[in-house]
């Protein structure tokens, strides 16, 4: 798997001051309304590759965007700080180097925010794809007449996983990606489709019970 970022985002004109293994970004034209960011700059040994994969997964789970190889960014909030400090600690435990930066972007911040939106849209697209698969599976069960409680339970588990996946993406979605509402609506449609399938399962069960009763001694 390639852990390099797809498109770098440039943060420029920053002055760095060193303090206790962390850098603080000081921007000359500071504005109180300016959004603040954490930027983690790290380097790991080339081998084994699983170390890089582990850090990449941790940062990706937090919703970080890679500005370039070994440079990741998150909004400077409590969630972002926990994720960045945890990743930095893991890098050091893997005999790598890590510097955590906190500050403001001077220019091009819209591109940085846009990169977060693109990353979340890609994840929402995966949710939408799984929703289509979910509907297709229910249609296959209907066509085969498999209106059983076993099939219902299996599809309920799939829907629970789909809902949990959506919630994880929503937690990473700091800026309201364009596809968010579409993904929520798609998961809701899956739930409604499952309820309709459940009604068919109950109807089939009731019909089977009635048939057994009428054919009894």
Which residues does each predicted region cover?
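Glycine-rich, aromatic-bearing surface loops/beta-hairpins
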Residues: 159-217
């Amino acid at each position: 798997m390639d852990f390099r970022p797809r498109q770098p985002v440039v943060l420029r004109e920053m002055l760095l001051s060193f303090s206790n293994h962390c850098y603080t970004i000081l921007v000359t034209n500071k504005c109180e309304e300016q959004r603040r960011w954490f930027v983690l700059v790290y380097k790991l040994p080339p081998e084994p590759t699983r170390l890089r994969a582990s850090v990449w997964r941790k940062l990706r789970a937090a919703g970080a965007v890679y500005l370039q190889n070994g440079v990741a960014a998150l909004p400077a909030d409590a969630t972002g700080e926990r994720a960045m400090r945890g990743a930095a600690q893991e890098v050091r435990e893997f005999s790598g180097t890590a510097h955590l930066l906190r500050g403001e972007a001077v220019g091009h911040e819209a591109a940085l925010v846009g990169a977060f939106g693109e990353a979340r849209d890609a994840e929402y697209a995966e949710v939408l794809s799984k929703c289509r698969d979910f509907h297709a599976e229910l249609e296959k069960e209907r066509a085969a007449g498999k209106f059983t409680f076993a099939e219902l339970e299996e599809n309920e588990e799939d829907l629970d996983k789909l809902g949990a996946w959506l919630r994880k993406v929503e937690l990473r979605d700091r800026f309201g990606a364009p596809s968010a509402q579409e993904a929520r609506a798609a998961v809701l449609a899956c739930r409604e489709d499952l309820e309709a399938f459940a009604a068919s399962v109950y109807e089939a069960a009731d019909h089977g019970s009635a048939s057994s009763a009428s054919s009894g001694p």
